[in-house]
Amino acid sequence: MPSASKNFRLQSKYVFLTYPKCSSQRDDLFQFLWEKLTPFLIFFLGVASELHQDGTTHYHALIQLDKKPCIRDPSFFDFEGNHPNIQPARNSKQVLDYISKDGDIKTRGDFRDHKVSPRKSDARWRTIIQTATSKEEYLDMIKEEFPHEWATKLQWLEYSANKLFPPQPEQYVSPFTESDLRCHEDLHNWRETHLYHDEGRTGVRHPSLYICGPTRTGKTTWARSLGRHNYWNGTIDFTNYDEHATYNIIDDIPFKFVPLWKQLIGCQSDFTVNPKYGKKKKIKGGIPSIILCNPDEDWMLSMTSQQKDYFEDNCVTHYMCDGETFFARESSSH
């Protein structure tokens, strides 16, 4: 007998039960269910047996009530030590066809052809999508509300779950050691003061860092070697945003294609983003960004004077000199 569950609640006039590997007699189970549900004005009951290949017997039951129950005890339907799987019957005709496929079924009462309307079904799906907070919870809610879809379309449901709740990517590990790289004194000061700062200092908005320089000089390699970060190249998508990162990297993305640039550059906290194929979410933020670009896509050339004012107030700007590189060894070519 399962332990009591505070979360269990059955409020459906149409119920589908399955008793796996049950050694009881079908007629005894039938009589038990009919008497148990009489207070709820039962008007149809069907109990069918199914012989599995392993030689065990499963019993299925379709229950139709005239009065909606509110059952909080998960052991309510337990019979002779057998606990059933309990599901709302979304489509009574479909359930009846399924349980009677072997022909061994006992019924009583007048069957009603019932199924959830498409509008109500859409509303249930919408609720699941809007309220689930993780992939596991999303799939569990579907299994509870739509067991048939869960059993027959799990592969597609997992695909949608991964879109809504994408797995966190593996943390980047730099292939270079600290001795392989070097940086300008200004960048060293920014790193030590604003990136490797004392985390106990709260309420401080640290400036971001803007580096504009030629290709193949090690800008990306150096930036990615500094610690745990979010990395965006080509486009910004918050789907896999890492809340535990200590900084962001915006690499080779033109200024006009950077959404929420003030929030990212200004080290702002608690702002709402809209990931691709996902639902809006609030991210903690509060971390600086490193912007990397080549001279042909210098952000300053695309900004208005007001945008430049905000940018310069919230960002340390570094234009690389001729011959400047982030590699300490000439043999490096990344």
Curated annotation (Swiss-Prot):
<feature type="active site" description="For DNA cleavage activity">
    <location>
        <position position="98"/>
    </location>
</feature>
<feature type="binding site">
    <location>
        <position position="58"/>
    </location>
    <ligand>
        <name>a divalent metal cation</name>
    </ligand>
</feature>
<keyword id="KW-0479">Metal-binding</keyword>
<feature type="binding site">
    <location>
        <position position="50"/>
    </location>
    <ligand>
        <name>a divalent metal cation</name>
    </ligand>
</feature>
<comment type="similarity">
    <text>Belongs to the geminiviridae Rep protein family.</text>
</comment>
<feature type="short sequence motif" description="RCR-1">
    <location>
        <begin position="16"/>
        <end position="19"/>
    </location>
</feature>
<dbReference type="GO" id="GO:0005524">
    <property type="term" value="F:ATP binding"/>
</dbReference>
<keyword id="KW-0190">Covalent protein-DNA linkage</keyword>
<dbReference type="InterPro" id="IPR049912">
    <property type="entry name" value="CRESS_DNA_REP"/>
</dbReference>
<dbReference type="InterPro" id="IPR001191">
    <property type="entry name" value="Gemini_AL1_REP"/>
</dbReference>
<feature type="domain" description="CRESS-DNA virus Rep endonuclease">
    <location>
        <begin position="9"/>
        <end position="111"/>
    </location>
</feature>
<keyword id="KW-1048">Host nucleus</keyword>
<dbReference type="InterPro" id="IPR022692">
    <property type="entry name" value="Gemini_AL1_REP_central"/>
</dbReference>
<dbReference type="GO" id="GO:0016779">
    <property type="term" value="F:nucleotidyltransferase activity"/>
</dbReference>
<keyword id="KW-0540">Nuclease</keyword>
<feature type="region of interest" description="Transactivation">
    <location>
        <begin position="236"/>
        <end position="254"/>
    </location>
</feature>
<keyword id="KW-0238">DNA-binding</keyword>
<keyword id="KW-0067">ATP-binding</keyword>
<dbReference type="GO" id="GO:0006260">
    <property type="term" value="P:DNA replication"/>
</dbReference>
<feature type="region of interest" description="Oligomerization">
    <location>
        <begin position="160"/>
        <end position="172"/>
    </location>
</feature>
<dbReference type="GO" id="GO:0003677">
    <property type="term" value="F:DNA binding"/>
</dbReference>
<keyword id="KW-0548">Nucleotidyltransferase</keyword>
<feature type="binding site">
    <location>
        <position position="60"/>
    </location>
    <ligand>
        <name>a divalent metal cation</name>
    </ligand>
</feature>
<dbReference type="Pfam" id="PF08283">
    <property type="entry name" value="Gemini_AL1_M"/>
</dbReference>
<feature type="short sequence motif" description="RCR-3">
    <location>
        <begin position="98"/>
        <end position="101"/>
    </location>
</feature>
<feature type="short sequence motif" description="RCR-2">
    <location>
        <begin position="58"/>
        <end position="60"/>
    </location>
</feature>
<dbReference type="GO" id="GO:0016888">
    <property type="term" value="F:endodeoxyribonuclease activity, producing 5'-phosphomonoesters"/>
</dbReference>
<keyword id="KW-0808">Transferase</keyword>
<dbReference type="InterPro" id="IPR027417">
    <property type="entry name" value="P-loop_NTPase"/>
</dbReference>
<dbReference type="Pfam" id="PF00799">
    <property type="entry name" value="Gemini_AL1"/>
</dbReference>
<dbReference type="GO" id="GO:0046872">
    <property type="term" value="F:metal ion binding"/>
</dbReference>
<dbReference type="GO" id="GO:0042025">
    <property type="term" value="C:host cell nucleus"/>
</dbReference>
<keyword id="KW-0255">Endonuclease</keyword>
<comment type="subunit">
    <text>Homooligomer. Rep binds to repeated DNA motifs (iterons). Forms the O-complex, which is a Rep-DNA complex involved in the initiation of RCR. Part of the C- and V-complexes which are RepA-Rep-DNA complexes involved in the c-sense and v-sense transcription.</text>
</comment>
<dbReference type="GO" id="GO:0004386">
    <property type="term" value="F:helicase activity"/>
</dbReference>
<keyword id="KW-0378">Hydrolase</keyword>
<keyword id="KW-0678">Repressor</keyword>
<keyword id="KW-0347">Helicase</keyword>
<keyword id="KW-0547">Nucleotide-binding</keyword>
<keyword id="KW-0511">Multifunctional enzyme</keyword>
<protein>
    <recommendedName>
        <fullName>Replication-associated protein</fullName>
        <ecNumber>2.7.7.-</ecNumber>
        <ecNumber>3.1.21.-</ecNumber>
    </recommendedName>
</protein>
<comment type="function">
    <text>Essential for the replication of viral ssDNA. The closed circular ssDNA genome is first converted to a superhelical dsDNA. Rep binds a specific region at the genome origin of replication. It introduces an endonucleolytic nick within the conserved sequence 5'-TAATATTAC-3' in the intergenic region of the genome present in all geminiviruses, thereby initiating the rolling circle replication (RCR). Following cleavage, binds covalently to the 5'-phosphate of DNA as a tyrosyl ester. The cleavage gives rise to a free 3'-OH that serves as a primer for the cellular DNA polymerase.</text>
</comment>
